């Protein structure tokens, strides 16, 4: 259920997935995950797990490797080494197509189609056949309602604001009720009320529908809304813990302060290593 930008190749119907992994297994498991792009190591020896049915925040400054990590998870990133298992399969496995919803930073919608037509199109790819028409219609209507675009359902996507187009992309990702949602900066360009409403939706999807969410952001106050956090800097993982545990570990009052203290610790350790060589 990957989001594809207009003009990119379209996948055919995904094969029927086999029996899923046991419920207690993590949604994502990574060991020694590394991505090298030219002379630069973009992700360096990452190891982490993402628990099922929870919201995990992927936080760090722009350019730290968050989007690269998300592309690796959904199987679209080249030159990935190490272990990366997603929903019990290697990342990019064909059976994951309809089990993952992916929202990129750039809205993946067709400007010359209405909101509903965009969703109808993607729903037909995910759930083809005439006999599925009623199910698709209900799925599309629910997704439009989820992202609060009911009053804009018949508006051309090209006439929407940037924030509204982002919400159309999110609605596409929600089609088919995926087990894992990978959302790259989904609240960028949204006003505080819509940000709050989307985070309420994310929690409903996790707790009410049992899905797993990985949500990236460079806005540290969004960290407080997550069950668990992956904090990144310069392609490395600084922390993999709960917000409460991070504050306790660093003696900080906020996650942002905790992040800055971890950055200072990492910088100091790197300098010490350089001077002892």
What are these regions (language model features)?
Residues 195-208:
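Helical segment within the ABC ATPase nucleotide-binding domain
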Residues 120, 124-127, 132-152:
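Conserved ABC ATPase "signature" region
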Residues 74:
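Helix-to-loop junction immediately C-terminal to a conserved catalytic motif
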Residues 79-96:
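Conserved ABC transporter NBD signature motif
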Residues 181-185:
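Catalytic Walker B motif of ABC-type/P-loop ATPase nucleotide-binding domains
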Residues 112, 156-160:
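Conserved ABC ATPase signature
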């Amino acid at each position: 259920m990957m989001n594809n930008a207009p003009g990119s190749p379209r996948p055919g119907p995904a094969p029927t997935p086999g029996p899923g992994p046991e419920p207690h297994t993590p949604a994502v498991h990574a060991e020694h995950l590394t991505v090298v792009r030219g002379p630069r190591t973009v992700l360096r020896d990452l190891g982490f797990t993402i628990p099922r049915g929870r919201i995990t925040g992927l936080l760090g400054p722009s350019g730290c490797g968050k989007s690269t990590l998300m592309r690796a998870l959904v199987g679209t990133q080249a030159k990935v080494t190490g272990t990366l298992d997603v929903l019990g399969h290697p990342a990019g496995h064909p059976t994951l197509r309809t089990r993952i919803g992916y929202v990129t930073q750039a809205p993946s919608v067709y400007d010359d189609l209405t909101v509903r037509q965009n969703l109808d199109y993607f729903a037909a790819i995910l759930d083809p056949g005439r006999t599925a028409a009623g199910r698709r219609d209900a799925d599309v209507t629910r997704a439009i309602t989820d992202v609060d675009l009911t009053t804009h359902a018949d508006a051309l996507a090209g006439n929407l604001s940037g924030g509204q187009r982002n919400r159309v992309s999110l609605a596409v990702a929600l089609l088919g009720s995926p087990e894992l949602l990978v959302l790259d900066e989904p609240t960028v360009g949204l006003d505080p009320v819509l940000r709050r409403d989307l985070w309420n939706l994310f929690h409903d999807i996790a707790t009410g529908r049992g899905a797993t969410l990985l949500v990236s952001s460079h806005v540290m106050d969004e960290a407080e809304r997550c069950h668990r956090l992956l904090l990144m800097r310069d392609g490395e993982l600084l922390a993999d813990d709960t917000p409460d545990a991070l504050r306790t570990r660093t003696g900080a009052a906020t996650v942002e302060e905790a992040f800055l203290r971890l950055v200072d610790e990492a910088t100091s350790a790197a300098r010490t290593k350089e001077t002892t060589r």
